[in-house]
């Protein structure tokens, strides 16, 4: 057993990534040896202690799990704990009581609160373990709404049931930083693994590279068709590595006045260095760094020269990684594509069937799907669809479903009855009809109208 007993009642365990089926459900999957040591059974509650304290419901890992000694939790639980994947936390069994009162605060949106809404949220949270300061997700009409536990009585790990007095505040949390986790990215398993090694590791543990006497990668160029997840991958890397992110959009930063664009670039690189660890993400880099022999204006040539100067020398830039994204890698100036600048290039390609299934699971997570929908079969039909295409397809399928129900809905009434809303579902034919509307990105050049 590779588990590390902390004492007779707790274990030190490594954090692992949750699967799509567990996202937003406060589950922690652990192996049978860990269950035996902690004397817990599936469905019981465990306390998790990282930088902060949280809790989760125990579930068994899959039999074919490659890392049975890890505790698998979703991105929201990792945030509640203040940890990232591969960090070590303390795990122990905990006895919970029923919460007498709980106060929730919406994280991003201002909400209109009435008794019906409060009862709906309370019903969704019934049985879930919570503690003060946690953030939790509630699926409301297909959308995930996040709440922060503002107050809980008694002050310990508790569960919500019918007797709990639940209060929901209408004002949102003011200091919310939007967080995208690895569970929000589908179809890029191998790419995420590689990017974590070359981006997240140097940002979190630069001492590893100092000890070995080598410099980590200073820049990574992501290339591939539009909508495959290049920007999303950059955002999730910044979030999971607790790095500050500075975005530069190629066409937007260009300025016709002499020296303005170069000054903007210098300011962004300086700010990133002052607030390191940082990730600078340059989207559509071919717009600001085209091949100099193919452009006639001095502005583009000066900008390329400035970018080359800024990217030279890791020690001068500090703990900063530069990510560039383009769907035209051959249009980028070759001087940028050499060691010391963008010294690694990674293709973010159109997802395969397994990748499309992952993406479908993400975008249909809150959708009421009919029983005739088998996501694996649907994914096999979506050849050539990128992540953005699948997101658009799911939205279009929902619109098709709404059109089917419109004759039964009284649009003049102030509110649509909750019974009517609960009966709505999306059928397989809605997806098939939507496939005529959403043309896959990878097939557009072959598409005949």
Show where each model-derived region lies.
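Beta-strand/loop-dominated core regions that host nucleotide or nucleotide-derived cofactor-binding catalytic loops
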Residues: 1-183, 197-200
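AAA+ P-loop ATPase motor domain of ring mechanoenzymes
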Residues: 2-19, 153-449
């Amino acid at each position: 057993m590779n588990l590390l007993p902390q004492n007779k009642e707790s274990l030190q365990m490594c954090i692992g990534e949750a699967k799509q089926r567990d996202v937003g459900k406060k589950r922690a999957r652990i192996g049978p040896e860990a269950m035996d040591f902690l004397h817990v059974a599936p469905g019981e509650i465990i306390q998790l202690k990282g930088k902060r304290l949280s809790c989760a419901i125990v579930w068994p890992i899959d039999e074919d799990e490659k890392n049975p000694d890890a505790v698998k939790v979703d991105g929201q639980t990792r945030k509640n704990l203040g940890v990232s994947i591969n960090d070590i936390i303390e795990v122990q069994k905990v006895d919970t009581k029923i919460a007498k009162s709980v106060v929730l605060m919406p994280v991003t949106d201002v909400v209109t609160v009435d008794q019906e809404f409060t009862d709906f949220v309370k019903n969704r949270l019934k049985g879930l373990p919570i503690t003060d300061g946690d953030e939790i997700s509630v699926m409301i009409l297909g959308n995930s709404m996040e709440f922060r536990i503002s107050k809980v009585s008694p002050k310990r790990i508790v569960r919500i049931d019918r007797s709990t007095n639940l209060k929901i505040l209408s004002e949102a949390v003011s200091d919310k930083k939007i967080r995208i986790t690895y569970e929000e990215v589908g179809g890029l398993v191998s790419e995420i693994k590689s990017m974590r090694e070359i981006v997240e590791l140097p940002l979190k543990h630069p001492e590893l590279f100092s000890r070995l006497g080598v410099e980590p990668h200073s820049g990574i160029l992501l290339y591939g068709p539009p909508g495959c997840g290049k920007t999303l991958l950059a955002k999730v890397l910044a979030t999971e590595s607790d790095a500050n992110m500075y975005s530069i959009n190629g066409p937007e930063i260009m300025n016709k006045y002499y020296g303005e664009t170069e000054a903007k670039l210098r300011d962004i690189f300086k700010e990133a260095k002052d607030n390191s660890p940082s990730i600078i993400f340059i989207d559509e880099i071919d717009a600001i760094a085209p091949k100099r022999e193919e452009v006639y204006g001095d502005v583009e040539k000066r900008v390329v020269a400035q970018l080359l100067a800024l990217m030279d020398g890791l020690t001068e830039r500090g703990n900063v990684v530069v990510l560039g994204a383009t769907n035209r890698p051959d249009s980028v100036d070759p001087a940028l594509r050499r060691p010391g600048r963008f010294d690694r290039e990674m293709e973010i390609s159109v997802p395969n069937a397994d990748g499309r299934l992952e993406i479908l699971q993400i975008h249909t997570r809150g959708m009421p799907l009919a029983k005739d929908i088998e996501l694996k079969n649907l994914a096999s039909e979506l050849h050539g669809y990128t992540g953005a295409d699948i997101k658009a397809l799911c939205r279009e399928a929902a619109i098709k479903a709404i059109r089917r129900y419109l004759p039964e809905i009284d649009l003049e009434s102030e509110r649509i009855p909750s019974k009517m809303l609960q009966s709505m579902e999306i059928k397989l034919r809605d997806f098939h009809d939507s496939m005529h509307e959403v043309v896959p990105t990878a097939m557009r050049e072959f598409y005949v109208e």
